[in-house]
Amino acid sequence: MALRPARCYRTTERRSYTRKEYVRAVPQPKVVHYVMGNSSVEFPVEVQLVSKSDILIRHNALESSRIAGNKYIMGECGRTGYLFNIRVYPHEILRENKMAAGAGADRISDGMRLSFGKAVGTAAKVKKGQEIITIGVNPERFYAAKEALRRCSMKLPTACKIVVTKGKELIKD
């Protein structure tokens, strides 16, 4: 069955559902790496992607955002010239009550009886003002990090802002 649109899951009004021991099978998050680049160096400039609203971000959106941003920053800075860090983890379990459609579906489907649903994915619960992604670079690569975060934000279902949290005085305009 096809993947439902993100609008079905993006609100945070529902109560958190994270208890894996009650769920028969939770799908693994698609996010492969949370820290990329050179983690042994302390970079003088740190730029963060910050959420502007409360939202659930699905694991496949986080993964596509990671790929887009990491690909760009690696091309600009090389393998050891940056530190890329995803700051959220998809703990929330997303459920779907699959409904049969078409001829004879009423005989097969249970409708809303036992409508709890099966786990179809995971999502990260992000609050307004929370950091989603952090990139550490040298001052001369600041604009590359900013562009990488802009590309990351295009893949996420919320409006984001880019904030310099460390080394603002080192950046030359």
UniProtKB/Swiss-Prot annotation:
SUPFAM superfamilies registered for this protein in UniProt: Ribosomal protein L16p/L10e (SSF54686)
Alphabetized GO MF terms: structural constituent of ribosome
Keyword Ribosomal protein among UniProt keywords: yes
CC per GO annotation: ribonucleoprotein complex; ribosome
Keywords for this protein: Ribonucleoprotein, Ribosomal protein
One of the GO BP terms on file: translation
InterPro entries documented for this protein: Ribosomal_uL16, Ribosomal_uL16_arc, Ribosomal_uL16_CS_euk_arc, Ribosomal_uL16_dom, Ribosomal_uL16_euk_arch, Ribosomal_uL16_sf
Taxonomy, superkingdom: Archaea
Pfam families linked: Ribosomal_L16
Gene3D superfamilies with a match to the protein in the record: Ribosomal protein L10e/L16
Keyword Magnesium set for record: no
Sequence similarity: Belongs to the universal ribosomal protein uL16 family.
Protein name as it appears in the record: Large ribosomal subunit protein uL16
Organism for this UniProt entry: Methanococcus maripaludis (strain C5 / ATCC BAA-1333)
